[in-house]
Swiss-Prot record:
Cofactor(s), names only, from the UniProt record: heme b
Descriptive protein name: Cytochrome b
Binding site for heme b b562: H83, H182
PROSITE patterns per UniProt: CYTB_CTER, CYTB_NTER
GO biological process, alphabetically ordered: mitochondrial electron transport, ubiquinol to cytochrome c
Listed transmembrane segments: 33-53, 77-98, 113-133, 178-198, 226-246, 288-308, 320-340, 347-367
Keywords: Electron transport, Heme, Iron, Membrane, Metal-binding, Mitochondrion, Mitochondrion inner membrane, Respiratory chain, Transmembrane, Transmembrane helix, Transport, Ubiquinone
Similarity-based family: Belongs to the cytochrome b family.
Amino acid sequence: MANLRKTHPLLKIANDALVDLPTPSNISAWWNFGSLLGLCLISQILTGLFLAMHYTSDISTAFSSVAHICRDVNYGWLIRNLHANGASFFFICLYLHIARGLYYGSYLYKETWNIGVVLFLLVMMTAFVGYVLPWGQMSFWGATVITNLLSAVPYVGNSLVQWIWGGFSVDNATLTRFFAFHFLFPFVVAGATMLHLLFLHETGSNNPVGLNSDADKIPFHPYFSYKDLLGFIIMLTALTMLALFYPNLLGDPDNFTPANPMVTPPHIKPEWYFLFAYAILRSIPNKLGGVLALLSSILVLMVVPILHTSKQRGLTFRPASQLLFWILVADMLVLTWIGGMPVEHPYIIIGQVASVLYFSLFLVLNPLVGWLENKVMNW
């Protein structure tokens, strides 16, 4: 008789995704980040749910409700620290997952890649509205600055901003709707993740050499289920250590001050995982131009498959393109550093050079070097 796990309509879906999935035998630890992102999403939804049970989305009580969670709710401090630092781990895994895709040419699975970019944007939106909820100084001013960027949209900009605010400034209506969005979006992300996996399983996973691996596939379980489990243990250990020993390491001290529309903090900046995009935004001395650059810094990922010129898929055997990849990594780190610095000399020019290099790498240098490597192979 056939196994229930292979015949039951529901179990069959789980089986095809997690048990009997044919997987390339040579995928490395860089392929662990997809499942780690799934774990991040689940842990964020769970900790977020417990926080939402005690949080109030009203400007008069939001800040004190977060303090109440940390002081008076059983293990509330732990749940809050896991949730806040879980966001950082979410983005660390995201950036490493995207970097893996860029390095090994996984972006040639176009549907999977584009849904991934949409997922990235959704997670960024979720993190942004979530950062506003504690209603500290940086929450309030971050919300003010970032929502204000929409006023750069020609003709409808100002109406758009006031529509999102629900008034003429960031106020109670804004906080209430941001809480609603922050509760909703993770479930949208979970739905989009299902699509991401659906399209991935149409083609199967890529692998480090970028060749067809049909001749050498192994079942996902037990091999990769245990490999993923090891990744889970490492990440959860790191997250727990950060949440218990250094819970405020990545936060902004300004957010321990309740929001005050009358006092502007000396340096308004987002959480560390948005600093690279913030640096690109600030490097253009024009509002609309900055907003377009900010959007393009993420959407440029969508044109990567179109601009792939090499005959080889990944960078495993392409040293010149590898050099460009690591320059991109260094450039991202420089942009992250600049995003947290004040707008003054020499940071302005460093940010502008790094921003130009960022787009040049994606749009000009990588396609050019891929084309040159083809020439060298023929020669």
